[in-house]
């Protein structure tokens, strides 16, 4: 499946070493001011090659809007956006065209489809997430009109955990670190792994404030369930926590319950959802990313002809995919919340009367 969402749908297309990648965002209400500079700035945050902590592949990621916008406003029709690939080096993958790279989707794609684009992983490459960020930027513009703000940052790298959640600091950090006190250690861990032809994992914290009460569609389209689905659909994501997540299994009910006052909740262990519906508190999501599977070490694998061989990779790869993954997490949260906002419009007669009355 290449489409995400119910009322607001994002369909992406393209491959890592193809001519272009892009998306079609359908369901955006007419009359939304489309800030193209903002969309580009979001792509610039995710684009590769900004520092030695990222892949050496340099792409401008310049986005072009093809449809759905007239005189700066959304028209209510599908918004199509395209990003042309300009820095492919497909020859780097000639030596792996007949073998399966450990940790990658090569093995499963080949056995599912009987054919695969071996150049940079083709459709399974994280390059595709640029299209998600473009669509997510439009969703952010929608949510801004509703007073919703989404932020993210790395709270852990290679087991080095931060204790501070400074989202303003993360905006200027090369690795989107939330805790300045551990940023240097986290950066050193990434660079050391890179020097040793290895990679590291990380954890991204994504939050949303200003979320209205009532978003989420029980029982099978709950807000927390869809957020988990959205994050798990990102390349290299291996686990998702909502609120206190796994830690809540170690609490007593008396510790885990968020008591309620007329001023609001006294705590936020639930992470902003109850019964799969937003409760008005801050949405809190942690996404755990595995180490980048592309490492420059000899590894055992097999070929498409069932031969055991040694794999030696080439190319340009992120030593820690979680860094740029933070921007993608924001995009997926934005798409989820914007979709939920549209779905919620018809849940009360009062809502319909406001529109049609």
Swiss-Prot record:
Query: What are the protein's UniProt keywords?
Result: Amino-acid biosynthesis, Aromatic amino acid biosynthesis, FAD, Flavoprotein, FMN, Lyase, NADP
Binding-site positions, FMN: 123-125, 235-236, 275, 290-294, 316
SUPFAM superfamilies reported for this sequence: Chorismate synthase, AroC
- Coiled-coil region: none
Q: Which Gene3D superfamilies match?
A: Chorismate synthase AroC (3.60.150.10)
**What does the record note about the cofactor?**
Reduced FMN (FMNH(2)).
- Molecular functions (GO terms): chorismate synthase activity; FMN binding
**Catalytic activity, as annotated:** 5-O-(1-carboxyvinyl)-3-phosphoshikimate = chorismate + phosphate
Presence of the UniProt keyword Transcription regulation in the record: no
Q: Which cofactor does it need?
A: FMNH2
Q: Any idea of its EC number? A: 4.2.3.5
Q: In which pathway does it act?
A: Metabolic intermediate biosynthesis; chorismate biosynthesis; chorismate from D-erythrose 4-phosphate and phosphoenolpyruvate: step 7/7
Please report a single Pfam family linked to this protein.
Chorismate_synt
> Subunit info?
Homotetramer.
Which family would the database say this protein is a member of?
Belongs to the chorismate synthase family.
Annotated function = This reaction introduces a second double bond into the aromatic ring system.
Classification via PANTHER family: CHORISMATE SYNTHASE
What name has this protein been given in UniProt? Answer: Chorismate synthase
Q: What is the lineage of its organism?
A: Bacteria, Pseudomonadati, Campylobacterota, Epsilonproteobacteria, Campylobacterales
